[in-house]
Swiss-Prot record:
Further information: Unable to fully compensate for the loss of AOX1A when electron flow via the cytochrome pathway is restricted.
The protein, known as: Ubiquinol oxidase 3, mitochondrial
Molecular function terms from GO: alternative oxidase activity; metal ion binding; superoxide-generating NADPH oxidase activity; ubiquinol:oxygen oxidoreductase activity
Required cofactor names: Fe cation
Keyword Mitochondrion: yes
Cofactor binding, per record: Binds 2 iron ions per subunit.
Transmembrane segments: 143-163, 205-225
InterPro entries: AOX (IPR002680), AOX_sf (IPR038659)
């Protein structure tokens, strides 16, 4: 069970505890962490300044020397892992980590059945041609470009649904959170790969250009036809699954070094300490397959004439 699932189970109980005890945000977080397995909270007291070992090595201070986090009542909380070492990541917390469902079918394909489907499918097929010609078997570079693009659809969709929810004074059915989770998960893929390889200047230039063009194009597509946008993303994720399958084949064939997994990957996907690059690519491929299903699912809902809020949102779906 993931920390996120545990949180959803405990949330009603903890919420009532917060209301009855008057705990603040920091106190609530400490109360939550105390219920999580294999996680130990060293300090969560927000009622008094944090001092000593609970302060970061170089805290940000105001002009008169006050530590900003303490001044605003948001002191850092120290969390330890089961082996006693400190949790060192600020970009995600223990309850954001999870064990991926690697049993998902990675060969599933949505067969285009109408004009919109065919347009989405051939758009993706056309876009992948220059990418394949440029990267060929340079899997790490290809993966980094792929993840900078793959993190865009969830953010755009979540943002537009957020604005729609505010504009219409109605709930989104959980789809805002689901799509933003997808975007964050894709970003974590990128953060993992940059631990293994740094892009060259021209690759950064390509990312800058491609991301700018794709963000605006996808934004317009989502405004005009969300079902088309989700279908495009579904096919993009199918290609992502295929590219990671090729990556795995080359690792298995000895064409790409199976180096140790970076620490961030071990903590994020709760991998064993001796995990390798192959293990990382394997779980990332599973993530992409889940994103594929989410977006084809979202498109199918809208093709049937329904709004996303009418169907259960796949929150925490990995």
């Amino acid at each position: 069970m993931s920390y996120r699932s545990i949180y959803r189970t405990l949330r009603p109980v903890l919420s009532s505890s917060v209301q009855s005890s008057g705990l603040g945000i920091g106190g609530f977080r400490g109360h939550l962490i105390s219920h999580l397995p294999n996680v130990r909270l060293l300090s969560s007291d927000t009622s008094s300044p944090v001092s000593g070992n609970n302060q970061p090595e170089n805290p940000i201070r105001t002009a008169d020397g006050k530590v900003i986090s303490t001044y605003w009542g948001i002191p850092p909380t120290k969390i330890t892992k089961p082996d006693g070492s400190a949790w060192k990541w600020n970009c995600f917390q223990p309850w954001d980590s999870y064990k991926p469902d690697v049993s998902i079918d990675v060969t599933k394909h949505h067969k285009p059945s109408n004009f919109t489907d065919k347009f989405a499918y051939w758009t993706v097929q056309t876009l992948k041609i220059p990418v394949q010609l440029f990267f060929q078997r340079k899997h790490m570079c290809h993966a980094m470009l792929l993840e900078t693009v793959a993190a865009v659809p969830g953010m755009v969709g979540g943002m537009l649904l957020h604005l729609k929810s505010l504009r219409r004074f109605e709930h989104s059915g959980g789809w805002i959170k689901a799509l933003l989770e997808e975007a964050e998960n894709e970003r974590m893929h990128l953060m993992t790969f940059i631990e293994l390889s740094q892009p060259k200047w021209y690759e950064r230039a390509i990312v800058f250009t491609v991301q700018g063009v794709f963000f605006n194009a996808y934004f317009l597509a989502y405004v005009i036809s969300p079902k088309l946008a989700h279908r495009i993303t579904g096919y993009l994720e199918e290609e992502a699954v295929n590219s990671y399958t090729e990556f795995l084949k080359d690792i298995d064939a000895g064409k790409f070094e199976n180096s140790p997994a970076p620490a961030i990957a071990i903590d994020y996907w709760r991998l064993p300490k001796d995990a390798t690059l192959r293990d990382v690519v394997y779980v990332i491929r599973a993530d992409e397959a889940h994103h594929r299903d989410i977006n084809h699912y979202a498109s199918d809902i809208q093709f049937k004439g329904h709004e996303l809020k009418e169907a259960p949102a796949p929150i925490g779906y990995h």
